[in-house]
């Protein structure tokens, strides 16, 4: 139908036509192909993420200005990215979603300018920004301007870091330089089988190195969740990914000047019942008699958190340490915990970096950190030493020492050597340090200590094994316990395991008014 744009009615109709074109910028065939892969369109993702009727789109009518390679003949509205703002559970967020059905989601000048604009808006208004990545990369037809806009996006990612929460959803390809934007954000969520992220693809790798690798093995969700640690959650499908992001947002504040969201009903109940529950009482028998027998630290974490509700982060990467979010009396907290059922809970390179990054995230966004300790030390081996366990393990120490949020640490069993110091010790600035009677706080474990201290004695003994057992028992009785540390104030109290939740609650109540500042400086020089 012809529209007379010289009349008011015609102008209104013309706008409606343009907006309709913008909504259906991708061809029906492109949308069909997207759905056939189990992927939603950009708009479908945004609408599922945000509260109903809350999305306000920005730059819906923006179009590229390129004339190279016949581009002037195809100028769809929106230019392949949907941007705007809306709410999640009533809280404002800014979003952008790359649209693979338009130019393969490739980034050109206008595309990049739209993302930059919404990121600037997020920083000005102090609200989280969520990016949905599904892109073929830079728009080759627009040349170096595409690279320039990638750089502009990266700079804003860096400037927003620690100011507003940034979350990346990888819901398709994300390759080349584009990967560095999600890498800088606070959390990256990928979808099994449909998300792929890499610097160089399988074909280039085959050409340069001769290696044969599939796209899924190289940069799929499982690889980045288990091997590289680039991703924080592997979703079974796109709806699962979106649900995880909504859960994440529920624990995070709007920005670095805000408190984290809280459950008002729980917060107002200041006389909350602190009598031990059945779950609390079960902790008294959790730690095995043998120090070499493992147990699941999740049991401790879930007993302390409200309703046992724990949102784990990076569960598939470095499983020897647990990190994630929960609530205590309705208020968000971050949790770091050694996991004895994985590598005996030792700290290795991956675990150190995983926990360090998480502690710094909590510190940036005013979330108290609860630390549960059962660590026999750093993982020994040439592989660890040559790959930089000294430098990379120091990141965790650095993260705890620079944190100014409330820090509460509970030692459940082993806390040996340098790993004792690193795991939120009093010496690094933790506020309240508690220990169970099963805690063994010492320079090293009994077996290693006896081998060093009594080498001659054992060599001369008529029954070396019997003598060793005696000396090990003596060492554990006198040195591998929580009481020497308690005598010196390194732990504030030795508590019964069933008292843990109540003591953590009391500590966090006290620490709500904590104020601590670090020495003035531009920034620390964390050992990267």
PLM regions and their residue ranges:
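Ligand-binding clefts of soluble mixed alpha/beta catalytic domains
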Residues: 1-528
